[in-house]
A protein has these predicted regions:
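Mid-length scaffold segments of soluble, non-membrane domains
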Residues: 52-68
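Amphipathic, heptad-repeat alpha-helical segments
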Residues: 63-85
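C-terminal amphipathic alpha-helix
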Residues: 1-53, 86-141
Length: 141
């Protein structure tokens, strides 16, 4: 579940970055033009483009799925409190993975900062989440 949520957040986060960037630098792209352009011209404010993205029915559905995934993952993680001694190390690694996943999904649901800070923070969290998942795989059968 966490991997699915992280993958969806990665896709959404990359789209947010691209919409933001393409609006500022007036870069045409078939994926982002419907958010960054109006009547064949770029919107003047990147906030308008991001508003267009977050108003898009399909994108709203994706964000809603990410939120539902967060809720489900959090529920399951709470069930794992106080693991037996032999699983404490795996639980610690799982918690690290969860914290990276949660930070990344929250960032996508509510992007803040500048394009540069969002991009840097998102890329760092994306890498942290992948690294934490790789460590977690050591404990999976």
């Amino acid at each position: 579940k966490m991997l699915d949520g992280a993958a969806n957040a990665e896709t959404a986060g990359n789209l947010i970055k691209n919409v933001w960037y393409n609006t500022i630098y007036e870069k045409r792209d078939t994926t982002t033009d419907k958010y960054t352009m109006k009547s064949g011209r770029f919107v003047e404010d990147f906030n308008d483009a991001l508003g267009n993205l977050f108003s898009d029915e399909e994108f709203q559905k994706n964000i809603s799925e990410i939120q539902d995934n967060q809720d489900e993952v959090t529920f399951y993680l709470k069930q794992l409190k106080n693991p037996p001694k032999e699983y404490e190390e795996a639980y610690t690694v799982l918690k690290t993975y969860y914290e990276s996943y949660l930070s990344m999904t929250k960032m996508v649901i509510n992007p803040t900062g500048s394009l540069q800070s969002f991009s840097d923070d998102f890329n760092n969290l994306d890498t942290e989440t992948v690294d934490a998942y790789e460590k977690m795989k050591l404990y999976l059968n």
